Design a protein with these regions (language model features):
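Extracellular interdomain linkers/hinges and stalk-like, low-complexity segments
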Residues: 2-48, 118-165, 227-246, 251-255, ...
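Extracellular acidic, Ser/Thr/Pro-rich low-complexity tracts
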Residues: 42-49, 160-168, 207, 221-223, ...
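Strand-loop-strand motifs at the edges of beta-sheets in extracellular beta-sandwich domains
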Residues: 74-99, 184-206
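Short, solvent-exposed loop/turn segments at the edges of extracellular beta-sandwich modules
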Residues: 112-120, 221-228, 331-337
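Conserved aromatic anchor
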Residues: 203, 254-268
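Recognizes extended acidic, P/S/T-rich segments that occur
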Residues: 272-319
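Beta-strand-rich modules
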Residues: 314-335
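Conserved small/polar residues in nucleotide/adenosyl-binding loops
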Residues: 349-351
Length: 351
């Protein structure tokens, strides 16, 4: 008996809430004795909510949990002693290294949907797995994919490669929210072939893609051997807001006046002003180091919550003939995402 259970919360306080989508069918899976097995449901949330993954007890009759019954996880079967079985809670990839005994197995994945730290729904999916010893085929493999970081209005473009030791025909595919966005979705152009396959991910990011959480992308590579085997790789794409520009500063008495340009992304929610006595040397890559102003040893002295508020006067504990350095950043996504600082970070002011 197999079961599928889905729970979704509908609330005026939550706003629109869609159910989790999956691009991989939990059809009967095949694994080989003494060879690594991986599986991923290729899930994403159309609303951009975060997903987490866990292995749970299967559901039995009337969709009741089989906890405290005879059910045993595959790796806890005595004949599979020494093998490891688990799931990546962030990507959903199930791994079994390596099954020792042929037979029929079942495992169940709970995919939980989160928004602003609160659970708002989940899906429970059963997966049937057949482990066979009649397995001349070896699984294909995807070249490891590092996490990516891209600034708004830049284009992310790179190749993903996969190969097969048996020279079987390979098919490569992608899944994730970036490919299902209403505005400027990512594309994945692929070439399938014997022993080798590749895909080119291309994404021209825009202001609407700015958010705190990275975008998870899953890649699947499947051969046509006997039995058919697959490999999965997951990676994150972080989309960074544009650098704030046009900071001008002038000393008037024992105060400093600051003005700056509004960002071209009009979904900014406000600004943060930082100050440091002496110079600041920006040697860090802002895309890879969010919060770079703090990394420069600067102190937050002012925050605004209005896109049009681009003027500030600093008259707080400034010393005569002291040199000060200022930067301003724009805030996005309910002040959870901070832009790169203004390009005049090295300006020095005499009071």
């Amino acid at each position: 008996m197999f079961a599928l259970k889905s729970v979704i919360n509908i609330s005026a306080f939550l706003g629109h809430n869609s159910s989790i989508q999956f691009d991989e069918c939990p059809c009967p899976e095949i694994a080989c004795v003494n060879k690594p097995y991986v599986y991923n449901p290729m899930g994403y949330d159309p609303d951009g909510d975060s997903l987490s993954y866990a292995l749970v007890y299967p559901l039995g009759q009337s969709a009741l949990s089989l906890a405290n019954t005879v059910y045993t996880l595959p790796n806890l079967v005595p004949q599979n002693a020494g093998s490891s079985f688990g799931i990546d809670p962030l990507t959903g990839t199930v791994f079994w290294s390596n099954p020792q005994m042929q037979g029929e197995y079942n495992f169940t994945i709970k995919i939980t949907e989160w928004r602003n730290g609160f659970e708002i729904g989940y899906v429970i999916r059963d997966v049937q797995l057949t482990v066979t010893s009649q397995c001349p085929n070896n699984p294909p493999s995807i070249v490891a994919i590092p996490d990516q970081c891209v600034n708004v209005d830049d284009t992310l473009n790179f190749v993903i490669n996969g190969s097969d030791p048996n020279q079987d025909f390979l098919s490569i595919s992608s899944s994730g929210l970036p490919f299902n966005l209403a505005s400027n979705p990512a594309t994945f152009a692929f070439v399938n072939g014997n022993g080798y396959a590749n895909g080119v991910l291309n994404w021209r990011t825009t202001c609407t893609h700015i958010r705190q959480a990275p975008y998870l992308v899953n890649i699947q590579l499947t051969d046509n051997g006997n039995p058919t085997l697959s490999d999965f790789e997951s990676f994150n794409i972080k989309v960074r807001p544009p650098e704030l520009e046009g900071l001008n500063i002038s000393a008037v008495g024992n105060a400093v006046n600051l003005t700056w340009n509004k960002p071209y992304c009009n979904n900014a929610t406000g600004y943060s002003v930082y100050r440091k006595a002496g110079a600041a040397n920006p040697t860090l890559n802002c895309c890879d180091n969010p919060g770079i102003a703090n990394n420069l040893g600067m102190t937050l002295i002012h925050q605004t919550s209005n896109l049009n508020d681009t003027v500030y006067t600093d008259n707080n504990n400034l010393n005569i003939d002291e040199k000060y350095c200022y930067v301003v950043t724009a805030m996005y996504d309910y002040d959870l995402v901070e832009s790169c600082p203004t390009d005049t970070v090295l300006s020095l002011i005499h009071i």
